[in-house]
């Protein structure tokens, strides 16, 4: 019985995270269609292996430098490999006063929801 409950909890957690993931990707695409700046925060090597059309590569380690040139009210969609680094960039940019930023998650997640 205990393992059945654990399995049920695991299934719910996996399903819930998938729903959230697709929602954030869908929101990302909606913003992109409205003209948001698309920023890939992965490394240059990862970016060269594939990226979204019209994306610019501002690696997470360089976010503080690159975003000094961008209006803080500019709509921005961030993504990376899994959503972790773009989440870190989101938190940093929010703390810097950026008002229209969105963490769209990972590249594959975005591609699957296009």
Feature map (PLM): residue ranges:
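Rhodanese-like catalytic fold shared by cysteine-dependent sulfurtransferases
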Residues: 2-7, 18-36, 45-74, 84-114
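Sec-dependent N-terminal signal peptides of Gram-positive bacterial secreted proteins and lipoproteins
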Residues: 14-15
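Structural scaffold elements adjacent to functional motifs in cytosolic proteins
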Residues: 39-40
């Amino acid at each position: 019985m205990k393992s059945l409950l654990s399995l049920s909890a695991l299934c719910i957690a996996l399903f819930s995270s998938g729903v959230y993931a697709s929602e954030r990707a869908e929101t990302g695409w909606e913003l992109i269609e409205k003209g948001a700046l698309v920023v890939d925060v992965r490394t240059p090597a990862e970016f060269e292996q594939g990226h979204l059309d019209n994306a610019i590569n501002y690696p997470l380690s360089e976010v503080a430098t690159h975003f000094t040139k961008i209006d803080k009210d500019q709509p921005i969609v961030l993504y990376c490999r899994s959503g972790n680094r773009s989440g870190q960039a989101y938190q940093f940019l929010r703390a810097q006063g950026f008002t229209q930023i969105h963490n769209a998650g990972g590249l594959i997640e975005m591609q699957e929801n296009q």
